[in-house]
Amino acid sequence: FRPQDYKGPKTDRIRIYDDTSSDGSSDRITTFYEGSTATMNMAFAPDGSLYVATRSSIFCLRDTNSDDKADQNRPIVKLKTKGDYPHNGLSGLAFDGNGLLYFGFGENLGVDYSLVGNDGTTLSGGGEGGNIYSCDLDGNRLRRVATGFWNPFGLAFDRSGSLFAIDNDPDWRPPCRLLHIVNGG
């Protein structure tokens, strides 16, 4: 949460740091994108597009004219909720080998929510804990993969295609866990 008297940027920025002189230090900084808030995760898709997760949305950025600035911004998934704690929203982006995007969604403090894909698919809940979802790279075919987490993040696939996630708990509980995620789990 930004303090009331914060004098920095009003929104989050994604920046590119280049070492154009090859001396080991960045000497050129370019703002690739700015405008989101509570930006939680980024991941490059196999085609080079940058997928970004914020507390309440996932969108896809592309630089179509090679100027190191995002000039295309496509919505993928939207979260509708009154929950606003930034660290238990959408996060944990990972791509499988079959053209699907997987992502986590924290327990949202038990507040009701609706997750909406680009094809209108709407999945609703509240109070069941955190979830892992998948959709295609355009935000269609949204589905719940597994449920019952606190705050699943750090999703990754191994070479055999098995999905893993880190699930963190509230600070007063035992440490984070590395979990093997199975469909319907």
Question: Locations of the language-model features?
Answer:
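Beta-propeller domains with acidic blade repeats across secreted/periplasmic ectodomains
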Residues: F1-G185
